[in-house]
Amino acid sequence: MRLDRLTNKFQLALADAQSLALGHDNQFIEPLHLMSALLNQEGGSIRPLLTSAGINAGQLRTAIDQALSRLPQVEGTGGDVQPSSELVRVLNLCDKLAQKRGDNFISSELFVLAALESRGTLTDLLKSAGATTANITQAIEQMRGGESVNDQGAEDQRQALKKYTVDLTERAEQGKLDPVIGRDEEIRRTIQVLQRRTKNNPVLIGEPGVGKTAIVEGLAQRIINGEVPEGLKGRRVLALDMGALVAGAKYRGEFEERLKGVLNDLAKQEGNVILFIDELHTMVGAGKADGAMDAGNMLKPALARGELHCVGATTLDEYRQYIEKDAALERRFQKVFVAEPSVEDTIAILRGLKERYELHHHVQITDPAIVAAATLSHRYIADRQLPDKAIDLIDEAASSIRMQIDSKPEELDRLDRRIIQLKLEQQALMKESDEASKKRLDMLNEELDDKERQYSELEEEWKAEKASLSGTQTIKAELEQAKIAIEQARRVGDLARMSELQYGKIPELEKQLEAATQSEGKTMRLLRNKVTDAEIAEVLARWTGIPVSRMLEGEREKLLRMEQELHSRVIGQNEAVEAVSNAIRRSRAGLSDPNRPIGSFLFLGPTGVGKTELCKALANFMFDSDDAMVRIDMSEFMEKHSVSRLVGAPPGYVGYEEGGYLTEAVRRRPYSVILLDEVEKAHPDVFNILLQVLDDGRLTDGQGRTVDFRNTVVIMTSNLGSDLIQERFGELDYGRMKEMVLGVVSQNFRPEFINRIDEVVVFHPLGEQHIASIAQIQLQRLYKRLEERGYEIHISDEALKLLSANGYDPVYGARPLKRAIQQQIENPLAQQILSGELVPGKVIRLEANDDRIVAVQ
């Protein structure tokens, strides 16, 4: 008999049998070796065949292993093994059986039949396991489905549905799928398309995270519960596992062979199976090589004839990119659009999923947490869809609470560290013999005993709280199982079991759960097991950097004293500081318009009066860092073509993938201060882009993504009208001067731009009285730098007056002051430090000497 007439699986099993004989030091390859190899073969036909015939494959394997251990062993054969006469006889019988059946190749299941018709140890073992020629023949017919073996890979294609699909209806029966709430319209539309005679293939299209896969799971659950039309009752929903289908397909045509096997198996089911292909676009081009047919083209004939009931799911972009290009494939599918659910629908979905997440995380999820997750995620996470982003918030908040339950409470941890510290000190003091050390040791022992007592009490309490939590968890798990059992009993019509569960077990468990929850609520001191809206806000703040959590007392006071904080850096300019402070307070109190930026301001005034400094102070106040603002120098955007740098290059241009300078910065930090410095120097087209930002708090970048500016403070600075401010300052009141400056501004900016700004703030020129305060602030920075090098410095009032007089220029504001400090203080100090006149550790005094400032120690 030619070995190349065996199927691939049979050839592999024969090679494994040879290895087995070598390993056992047997001289001959017996039918037992081959049967053992076939039973252990991954993805082979023998185990499913025996199971189908009602034979316990595990027991048979044990019996064969025992028989193998009794075979005679020969040493010193030098690895020479050959088939025994018995094996040759059985293989010849296989050949004969294959010819009778009209097979071109000999498949491995015929070996079991041939072994039964032969005689020997294997025959006896098979018969004692319950195998007969009749039941094995019947199982073979069932497995083959009336087909003959015409190619070597025939066995690989068998049970393709089992290998390459996941049965969603089976998972729904076992209660492993999450409940699907709402989405009735989409599920009804899907069923409607599936009921058609031809082209009965719906494709679910929607943004990522809106619940396309959940709709198919909902369909599977409805089929199980019998809540579908007659035409769909008893159908199975199988999800195609593309990963398994492609994995390991090494040779050309192997992928197509597997897919063909799946399609053949589906054809045999005669419409009793609905195939679900998640990420449908992956089928287009899958397995495509030079001249080969891709998966999409292989599906077309079956889809068009209505033989294959297929439900696809893909996103809008990928549908357009892959499926719309192939018009022949597109027309075979019927589109079902899945829109993002509203906040109200999302709350209903979350309430339905609540129990599953409570069971998984062993925590309690409150209703305010669910409402907060839906509303906050809708408002603050712009680039993702509901319900996915809301579910993620709940999941992560529950996970963080669970982590706190599992880890040691902070109070215990602090005590533990203190005990370790005291023990180390105790060890050190025990080595000392002086009186002071002994006295300290006695005190330390007392403290140590006290801390250890506290620790053990707290630990007991912690363990008790953990135990009570796990108690409620066990009851919840039992209740969940009882609910699944009642559903299964309802499907099969077991009324006795249903009544036992409904009126006996479930009410009893609910009573136990209520009692356990009440006792739990009384005792909790160290552990929190509830997810509230505060935890949701905390997680959201961690994701986006937007402070949406409830304000602590300290933060409220800080916001009420905001003007004082800003005035510590920005001298004068009361109107500007007040306008900015009010905008931030409105935002944190939740009163600002949710569809516009927190605040948008145009700062006008002469150079050096604190316009940019106020932005830095604001960023520092909000984020504790001057760098936490997006600063864009508008003088860089003077040409028309440079506008695209803000939002990103359009498609087809170099740099398209990189995104825009402004949009990318805000996408990364949605909560920030945006400073557009020297705004009048920018090209007029830049203002057209800013119109959407100021009005709707949004901007579309070069790649079509919408960037959310609703949590930003937009500040623009300009020098327009500064000559008027300089000339008329002191002559006119603030209101009159502001009107005049706005007249100049309206000549440079369009009315629709000025109209969208919350407030135009005119900065005053600085007076001599302001310069002294600014000098103090500037000097503080110098003191800090010197302090790091070990120098302490003080300035006399006369020296400060002299410095202010030298640094004051009504035209240039406070900037000349910086130069004055540099020339009159920093330069002489640097020389004196380098020459060694000034030494670290001693106080340096800055005194006025005529029109100079001198440093003395």
Curated annotation (Swiss-Prot):
Instruction: List each copy of the Clp R domain by range.
Output: 3-146
Binding-site residues for ATP 2, renumbered to this chain = G605, P606, T607, G608, V609, G610, K611, T612
Q: Mainly resides where?
A: cytoplasm
Q: Does the keyword Chloroplast apply?
A: no
Instruction: Cite the residue spans of the region called NBD2.
Output: 555-765
Give the span(s) annotated as Repeat 2.
83-146
Which source organism does the UniProt entry give?
A: Salmonella typhimurium (strain LT2 / SGSC1412 / ATCC 700720)
Cite the residue spans of the region called C-terminal: 766-857
* CDD domains from the UniProt entry: AAA, RecA-like_ClpB_Hsp104-like
Q: Which domain of life is it from?
A: Bacteria
- The UniProt record gives the binding positions of ATP 1 as G206, E207, P208, G209, V210, G211, K212, T213
UniProt keyword terms in alphabetical order: ATP-binding, Chaperone, Coiled coil, Cytoplasm, Nucleotide-binding, Repeat, Stress response
Q: Under which name does UniProt file this protein?
A: Chaperone protein ClpB
Pfam families (UniProt xref): AAA, AAA_2, AAA_lid_9, Clp_N, ClpB_D2-small
Compartmental location: Cytoplasm
Region spans: Linker: 341-545
Function summary: Part of a stress-induced multi-chaperone system, it is involved in the recovery of the cell from heat-induced damage, in cooperation with DnaK, DnaJ and GrpE. Acts before DnaK, in the processing of protein aggregates. Protein binding stimulates the ATPase activity; ATP hydrolysis unfolds the denatured protein aggregates, which probably helps expose new hydrophobic binding sites on the surface of ClpB-bound aggregates, contributing to the solubilization and refolding of denatured protein aggregates by DnaK.
Q: Which family does it belong to?
A: Belongs to the ClpA/ClpB family.
- Region annotation (NBD1) maps to 159-340
Q: Which residues form a coiled coil?
A: 391-525
**Gene Ontology biological process terms from the UniProt entry:** cellular response to heat; protein refolding
Query: How this protein is processed and modified after translation, per its record?
Result: UMPylated on a tyrosine residue by YdiU under ATP-limited conditions.
Q: What is known of its domains?
A: The Clp repeat (R) domain probably functions as a substrate-discriminating domain, recruiting aggregated proteins to the ClpB hexamer and/or stabilizing bound proteins. The NBD2 domain is responsible for oligomerization, whereas the NBD1 domain stabilizes the hexamer probably in an ATP-dependent manner. The movement of the coiled-coil domain is essential for ClpB ability to rescue proteins from an aggregated state, probably by pulling apart large aggregated proteins, which are bound between the coiled-coils motifs of adjacent ClpB subunits in the functional hexamer.
Q: Which GO terms describe its molecular function?
A: ATP binding; ATP hydrolysis activity
